[in-house]
Amino acid sequence: MKNLIGCVLCGGQSIRMGTDKGLISVEDTPWAKLSANKMEELNIPVVFSVNQNQLSNYKALFPTEQCITDHNINVEGPLKGLLSIHQEYPTLDILMMACDMIDMDKLTLSHLINIYQTEPNHDYYVYKHQDLIEPFCGIYTSGVLKNVMESIDNESFQDFSFQHILAIGNTKTIIITDNAPFKNYNKVSDIGY
């Protein structure tokens, strides 16, 4: 896809899991790769957002150019990872997935991409379950990410949560009809294999 790059967010602390979630394997395939495969099946190039402490482990599994470390941005958490990818690819829109969304399916991703392509006037494209927006399977456009970066640089931005950013933006929400693809795994007890 011409103007879209996939990003697998792997840079979290994984405190509740007790280990780097992106490196947990299912049948010898790390979760980060499982998530990437889902986007690559749709011909979307993929990069991995990692923190500096993870870089050597990820470079052992993936090409160096696909491993993007957090940039020096005055924000923390997943937004830092997303904006670091944006700084590397400032003209591309980003399809972002968390590394633990291993149940995400091609149909759900294809539906998101179809809406992104047919309704191009939005800043963000995300799924929604009742009143809760699911930010970690969403498309974030380059123009609005540039604006978010400028707001951070100008210190005019105070709430860095995805829920806030999506609430104030021109966000296209898509109602979730099947919860299974959105399961994420936060604790060892969540893993059923």
Positions of PLM-derived features:
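Short, conserved phosphate/pyrophosphate- and ester-handling motifs at nucleotide-, phospho-/glycolipid
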Residues: 141, 187
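RNase H-like, Mg2+-dependent phosphodiesterase core
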Residues: 147, 189-193
